[in-house]
Amino acid sequence: MRQAIAHAVDQKIIANVVLKQTVIPAYTMLPTHFPGYVGDKHQAYQQFDPNRARQLLNEAGFPNGRGFPKVEMWIGDAGPETVIGQAAQVIQQQLKEVLNIQIAIRNVQGNTYFQRMYAWEIPMSLGGFGYDFPDPQSLLGVVWRSQPKGFTRHDWRNDRFDELIDRAARELDHDTRFGYYDEAEQVLASDVGGVFLWHRLAHDLRKTWVKGIKQDQWGNYPFRGNNTTYYEMYIGDER
């Protein structure tokens, strides 16, 4: 059923039309140019495919949506005019058009939203997560490795995923470690621990006399979020 929903959502419509190209479509957890990013390697698991979505829903026992349970999609403090609110409405419409299932949108106060989420009392939610540190562990291990109720946002569990995350946490060799994360992300996308929708775009402006911000392997000069610890940054003479 999760796989059917994943293939029924058109990430490109959400990113390019609804959110006006301020984001890029997402098919996995790690965003473009994030450490461990593997391009479109795992995209097929969650790309928009209406026929495949209908087939999977039929195999799950709900042909043309018949007998599908009533489900609410929770959002926290996000009215219909917000980014989350607009995306929720589009997802609601797409699931109706592709799978003939009706999802109700429930907007609740933020504290209630997170309390119920960590109690695993939300059947379906729409939200986001920002990394704590630039490493796959932050977006894969911290968010998705299974934990007891009250310690994580969801009750999704996959033993192979957990094993790979734990191996990566102990591994010292860079290539081997990132290989574990690559396979873990494949498991996450294919088993649909979550349906991935978009990654935000960030734009930086800085004065020419700000020096010492190091170029990363993709030619960018990141200075945002948790990429702000630079011991060689200084003010130069160019003004």
Residue spans for each PLM region:
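Structural transition elements
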Residues: P25-A60, A78-Q86
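Pocket-flanking alpha-helical
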Residues: I13-V18, N111-W144, L188-A189
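Short, solvent-exposed loop/beta-turn-alpha elements that line the ligand-binding surface or hinge
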Residues: P35-R52, P63-P69, R116-W120, G141-R170, ...
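Short, solvent-exposed loop/turn and secondary-structure capping segments
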Residues: N16-Q21, T28-M29, V83-A87, P136-L139, ...
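Solvent-exposed, polar/charged alpha-helical surfaces in well-ordered, non-transmembrane soluble domains
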Residues: Q3, H7, K12, N16, ...
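Ligand/substrate-recognition segments at binding pockets and active sites
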Residues: N58-Y131, R153, H174, A202
